[in-house]
Structure formats: C-alpha cells, structure tokens
Amino acid sequence: MEPYALTMHELHDLLVRKELSVTETLTSFLTRIETLDPRLNSYLSVLAESSLAEAGRFDRGERDLHASPLAGIPLAIKDVLCMQGTVTTCGSRILENFVPPYDGTVIARLREAGAIFLGKTNMDEFAMGSSTENSAYGVTRNPWDRERVPGGSSGGSAAAVAADLCSGSLGTDTGGSIRQPASFCGVVGLKPTYGRVSRFGLVAFASSLDQIGPITKDVEDAAILLQAIAGHDRRDSTSVDHPVPDYRASLREPIKGLRLGIPKEYFVHGMHPEIADSVQRAINVCLQLGAEVGEVSLPHTGYGVAAYYIIAPAEASSNLARYDGVKYGLRVPDARDLIGMYRTSRSQGFGAEVKRRIMLGTYVLSAGYYDAYYTKASQARTLIRKDFLDAFDSFDALLAPVAPVPAFKIGEKSDDPLQMYLNDALTLPASLAGVPGISVPCGFSGEGLPIGLQILGPHFREDLLLRIAYQFEQATAHHLARPDSI
C-alpha cells in the first residue's frame, strides 16, 4: 500500500520500523498532490521544499521518530492558522501577502511533536461559509463528486484528507466547520470543547465560538492529533487549565451500559431520508454494542440558527475591523484620503459573504437594536447551553445527524444565503453551548455521497466521544471507503 493511503498510526509504525523513509513518505504525498490537487483545489500553498528538508533531518537521525506518534507525519493546516514565514491568507484577498512573524500555539506544539507541514488548505473566507465556495482563491471540490462542495469552512482540510493528500489535517469549527465537511467528505472531524485547544495564532472570526480541531482518516488518528494540541496556554485568555487525559488509552473500552440520547429536534422536517436512515442504522449498531438508547429533548434547538447568525457576525464585525490597509493586508494605491483608503481597501479586499456578515454584525450591535437582537440572542444561547447540561444529567452522550442533506452541488445554494445558513442547523447548537462534538462516517447516500454521525458530549469529555466513535468505527467499515476516482 502506498504511504499516502495509510492512517497516521499505520504510517508511523512503518517509519519507526524503518520500512519506509520519511523522504519516501513525503515524496509520495507531494507527487499525489501535484497530480490530483489541480482537480480539487484543496491546497492554497504546498511547502514542498521545507517539508522535504524536514524529512531529511529525520532520515539522517537529526530528529527522533520515537519522540511522538506524529514524528515524521505529513499534515495539512487550514489557512487560518498563523505559521511563521508562511503566507496565511484566510482565503481572503485582503491577506493575500500576509506572512505571520510567529507560529500559533497549535503549530508550535505540532512542530515540537515532529509533524511535517505539507501546506495550507483552502477555506471559506475568514471561515465564513459552509461550502468552501467563498474563498478568494477558487472553490474546493469534493473528492467523492467534483461537482459538489466539500462542506465548509474547513473544506480544503477535509477534502485533502479524503483524497489522501495528507495524513491528517487541522481545521477550525465556529458553527460546524469541522464536523460538516468531515461528514460531506467521509472522514472523521472533531470539534473540542471551547477552551480545550489554544486559539493563540488563530485568525479570529467569532472569538467566543472558534475552536481548532483535527480532521483525520480514522478515530485513533483524531485522538493522536488532539493529544498533541490540547492543553492550557497562558497566551490565550479563553484557554482552560483542565487536565488532558490520554485520549488513546480509553478507545478500546466497550460502550456497554453507556446511556446515549437521541435529540428529537435534530430529526427535522425536510431532512434527506437517507440521512435519517443512516443515522438510525448507526444507532442500532450502538445498541448492538450494548449501549442504552433513549429519546431526549433539546427544546431550544430551533433558536440556534437565529442566535448564531446574530452573535457570530457581531463578533466578526469587531474582529475584522483591524483590516484597514494600514498595518498589514491589502492597501489600495492612490487613495485620495485616509477614509477613502479604508473604504476602498476593505471593499476590494473582502468578499460578498464577509461584507454581508460585517454589515449584519454592525447592525445588531447598533444602539437602537442591541437589546432587540444581540441581548436576546445571548439569552437564547444560555438556554441552548442549559438544554445540553440538562440532557447530560440523564445521558452520557448524544447521537444525531451532522447535516440535513449530503454534499450539495456547487452553486446550488450560493444565491440563497438563508438556505446555506439553515444547513448548519444541526451543528450550531453544540458550538453555542461550547460542548465537544465529533463526526464519524456512518453511511452513504444512493448517489454514493458520505453521511456522518454526530456524537456530542459533556464539556471536556472528548475522551468519551472518541471512545464511542472508535467502538462504532470498529463495528462498521464506512471509514475505510475512499473515493474511487478523482
């Protein structure tokens, strides 16, 4: 089997046993990227020279392959994470030449673990989108059907993993941007608890929602990646100093006796019937594994979309105010005055969806509308969080669909922002509540499109989610499927 087709843990075993060199491994991936990625556009930049140089250090014995399970492993990084000396665009024209002078915390931790960075992946501009159609650098295509979207905003990261263009990747999840593309592309995607992973070096969209997490080929790989990046960071004031368990240690524990809740509000009217069928079959697998299953209500789920699309744009309008053409980013030439330079740089640098959300956020924060919109949205968020806390009093975890439909056609929802936003209805509540969630492959539609099972758990119980997902994965074969032709 080619190195690019292996999981991270399989690949690392071969590297440690010297059955493969790290240079051979990197060459395998780089050749595949050169051949296939022009059809997918999952990468915005490929770091061939630096990655091969790092591989050489391992092969010469200058770095130790035994140092960690990530030593010598080729990863892709969503282009919203600062990497020293590497262009970081956030999928936006306004940052097309921005080179960060430092590594974000997760990048620094992965470097220390010995991971090798293949490149930066495409994304919806500033992580605002659900399809990776909003990138200033072109749409990313789904490896299972190149006429369809890979999901978003971490679509490039998910597509790269699904197409074997990296061993694993990092994405970010503000309202579903790891879980939904993982579902659409048939891979594993984990959104950790808010505060579990440092956001230092993450270009902010909505600071109270953004979270970094792994996208991988299987659950064990997700545990390995999370192990490397989780933990307190004093440079991030929202990082929580909470013990980090050994995420691989509990993977093989049976789930017999666990109480799994099925939120009735997540099986919405208009859901694609094959989604509901696949999730029901996944629930039956968990029953066969000895779990106890029961219905639960999350009564304020219906307010999630409205609350999110008030809170997130409000935070974005503040965070994106820094892009004015003065310190960094696009600056238009020949502006007549300072205000004209601000206006023209921002209007030319930002795409349509980003402008829409900035305007929405500015509106809901304005004096006459703050109480009517932002305050009520914050109250709804509190109620949604309480729904989850109440549910976890009775259940260990929740099982649900990730999205109401499989991957949709490119351009199908582009002219209807509301329909695009509603596609996030099943992932937004967990983001608003700050609880962890994982998407694991659980089936395929009649058209051969992947479908994901969403598992949600209490704050800081990523270990439990990984255990449930792993046991489900071992009882099924959905995660082993790969696109036939790209």
Curated annotation (Swiss-Prot):
Q: What EC number(s) is this enzyme filed under? A: 6.3.5.7
Checking PROSITE patterns in the record gives:
AMIDASES
Reactions catalysed according to its record: L-glutamyl-tRNA(Gln) + L-glutamine + ATP + H2O = L-glutaminyl-tRNA(Gln) + L-glutamate + ADP + phosphate + H(+)
Q: Which GO terms describe its cellular component?
A: glutamyl-tRNA(Gln) amidotransferase complex
GO molecular function terms attached to this record = ATP binding; glutaminyl-tRNA synthase (glutamine-hydrolyzing) activity
Alphabetically sorted, this entry's keywords are: ATP-binding, Ligase, Nucleotide-binding, Protein biosynthesis
What's the top EC group for this one? Answer: ligase
Keyword ATP-binding recorded = yes
- List the active site: 78, 153, 177
InterPro entries tied to this protein: Amidase, Amidase_CS, Amidase_dom, AS_sf, GatA
Q: What Gene3D superfamilies does the record tag this protein with?
A: Amidase signature (AS) domain
Q: Where does the source fall among the domains of life?
A: Bacteria
Q: Does the keyword Magnesium apply?
A: no
Q: Which GO terms describe its biological process?
A: translation
On subunit structure and binding partners, the annotation says: Heterotrimer of A, B and C subunits.
UniProt xrefs under PANTHER family: GLUTAMYL-TRNA(GLN) AMIDOTRANSFERASE SUBUNIT A (PTHR11895:SF151), TRANSAMIDASE (PTHR11895)
Q: Which family does it belong to?
A: Belongs to the amidase family. GatA subfamily.
- Function of the molecule: Allows the formation of correctly charged Gln-tRNA(Gln) through the transamidation of misacylated Glu-tRNA(Gln) in organisms which lack glutaminyl-tRNA synthetase. The reaction takes place in the presence of glutamine and ATP through an activated gamma-phospho-Glu-tRNA(Gln).
- According to UniProt, the name of this protein is Glutamyl-tRNA(Gln) amidotransferase subunit A
Q: Which organism is it from?
A: Syntrophobacter fumaroxidans (strain DSM 10017 / MPOB)
